[in-house]
Amino acid sequence: MGQAGCKGLCLSLFDYKTEKYVIAKNKKVGLLYRLLQASILAYLVVWVFLIKKGYQDVDTSLQSAVITKVKGVAFTNTSDLGQRIWDVADYVIPAQGENVFFVVTNLIVTPNQRQNVCAENEGIPDGACSKDSDCHAGEAVTAGNGVKTGRCLRRENLARGTCEIFAWCPLETSSRPEEPFLKEAEDFTIFIKNHIRFPKFNFSKSNVMDVKDRSFLKSCHFGPKNHYCPIFRLGSVIRWAGSDFQDIALEGGVIGINIEWNCDLDKAASECHPHYSFSRLDNKLSKSVSSGYNFRFARYYRDAAGVEFRTLMKAYGIRFDVMVNGKAGKFSIIPTIINVGSGVALMGAGAFFCDLVLIYLIKKREFYRDKKYEEVRGLEDSSQEAEDEASGLGLSEQLTSGPGLLGMPEQQELQEPPEAKRGSSSQKGNGSVCPQLLEPHRST
């Protein structure tokens, strides 16, 4: 048995199995199946291949370098600084031209600060006092400007005052100008040079037009039809981001400049264009003290005696973040095969759904279910079922024939001819079956 089973298993390896198809003449289910096929085919062709370009291999590991330059000058005339010209070296931080840069639009200037003793600002809670013991010498003022000296400075007829501190004096004033300090900043220009590379396809490009005429960049400006002149007017960038220049220049803010590269490398390289979008990244909260963007910096000097002093500047301005992202695609047979296979699998899912409708949901589901599925049993089960049917058939014949079939005597009696029955009834008196044979033969 083991050898025969092994031989049968080996021979079964060369068997070919195929499916049996049942054609259901049901127009509703047939129409549903064709609609599913058409929908899946439209999804595969339109969405997967035409819109998502599923036949392409994609590279999203974009390598990018950004160089920025700001140009423009502003003129101011104040009591603290006098007449002054502000150029790029004054209002752009940092000066290296990176992808993140800051343009000063408003200033609070505190000139001629020297290290000395003076009263802490009244708005500092830790600097308030009523007597000298409230000001511990050598203790830094929390959220303040210096170190306490141990003295409490009070104005005339006032019970409370502020601690004397050792700091850069005079202290910075907290008042902010009602108008932007550098109004001309709205007309400054920003030059953004971006180089990108997709390493998988060894494809490189820049957002600057490849021309030898240097005057091109001095006269052109960015526009909807001029993507290869990345020179932006600062006020236009603020407007495209949905903000007002006067508001953001007064308190400061953060603007995002996004450069998107979506390149179809099945086409010419000249068809790969940068796309720009602008947005404000910080949340402008009108009732919040944390709105805006500012920081402090100082410029240090020495007088004739060699004593150091400085000019403190609290700068409000606009921070620009240049962000670059993108992807490149090129035809490849592998994603094409994968997406086509996925579409074929979806076709099978449509057939499965129609099978469920056919055998479970419509009115004639039992009829179609019987036609689709056949019940096949094993050999032993078939033999046992045949024996059961045979025994059941014999029992039914006995029940229909009457009690005579249950024993052999009755059966023989039913099989006797009518003549025998009459002969036996005529000889009941002597019990002899054939009395003539029992008489002796007489000679004559």
UniProtKB/Swiss-Prot annotation:
The gene is P2RX5. Residues 52-319 are extracellular. Functional P2XRs are organized as homomeric and heteromeric trimers. Homotrimer. Forms heterotrimer with P2RX1. It comes from Homo sapiens. The lineage of its organism: Eukaryota, Metazoa, Chordata, Craniata, Vertebrata. This is P2X purinoceptor 5. The second transmembrane domain and the conserved Asp-355 are essential for P2RX5 subunit assembly. Residues 378-444 are annotated as: Disordered. One of its GO terms (biological process) is response to ATP. It catalyses: Na(+)(in) = Na(+)(out); Ca(2+)(in) = Ca(2+)(out); chloride(in) = chloride(out). It comes from the Eukaryota. Glycans are attached at N77, N202. The chain crosses the membrane at residues 31-51, 320-362. One of its GO terms (molecular function) is extracellularly ATP-gated monoatomic cation channel activity. GO terms for cellular component: plasma membrane; postsynapse. The keyword DNA-binding does not apply. Keywords: Cell membrane, Disulfide bond, Glycoprotein, Ion channel, Ion transport, Ligand-gated ion channel, Membrane, Receptor, Transmembrane, Transmembrane helix, Transport. Expressed at high levels in brain and immune system.
